[in-house]
Amino acid sequence: MLRSRRLALLCLATPLWLAACASVTPTRGFDASETAASQLYTGRFSANYVRYGRNEGVQGSFRWQEQGRNVRLDLVSPLGQTLAIVTATPSGATLDLPNEAPRNAPEVDSLMEQALGFSLPVSGMRDWLHGRAAPGTPSNVTRDANGRPDTLRQSGWTVRYLAWQDTPENATPTTTLPRRIDMARDGNESPLSVRLVIDPENKE
């Protein structure tokens, strides 16, 4: 119980989370060349990781908006304060934090790791949120009795699909969307586990 309370209040225990009461405005927009339909996912997240040899944890809600290969990810504390806004496009990534100058990098994963101490695998999540492996990268997928992904291993991550959204009877494995996803980074050097619980009303 004590550990759970510490994790729930972690967002108030470090300078980053204390600064979250300030408003955060994303500085990078989506690439204008993208014409694909926009998709929106919202839900809750939790992450457990090791930083400076100590076990850490954070949780809150997220808002994931994608258009083609463009992604904007908002992380919000349990108190409703913006923790970070991540914008990733084919041309680069930007991380906006409260009361700090925007940080830019060619890709988003290492940018989050350096600034936050943990990194959601945004590059892979573009496809994993749809219940599929990312194209162009080796993967290993096991499926359940309904043909839906059960475990997906790709890019140094193990992704487990633990629950699926309620769907019409005529839904197929390619149209069903995940409800709960557990992700763990492979290896022991920098342990990181992430849980996503996706709201059922998400839609394209």
Curated annotation (Swiss-Prot):
Annotated InterPro entries: LolA/LolB/LppX (IPR029046), OM_lipoprot_LolB (IPR004565)
Signal peptide (from-to): 1-20
Description of how the protein assembles with itself and partners: Monomer.
Protein name (database record): Outer-membrane lipoprotein LolB
Subcellular location, principal: membrane
Subcellular location: Cell outer membrane
Lipid-bearing positions (N-palmitoyl cysteine): 21
Family annotation (Pfam families): LolB (PF03550)
Cystine pairs: none
Source organism, top-level taxon: Bacteria
Membrane topology: Lipid-anchor
Any one of the GO BP annotations: protein transport
One Gene Ontology term, aspect cellular component: cell outer membrane
Gene: lolB
UniProt keyword annotations, A-Z: Cell outer membrane, Chaperone, Lipoprotein, Membrane, Palmitate, Protein transport, Signal, Transport
Task of the protein: Plays a critical role in the incorporation of lipoproteins in the outer membrane after they are released by the LolA protein.
Source organism (scientific name): Cupriavidus metallidurans (strain ATCC 43123 / DSM 2839 / NBRC 102507 / CH34)
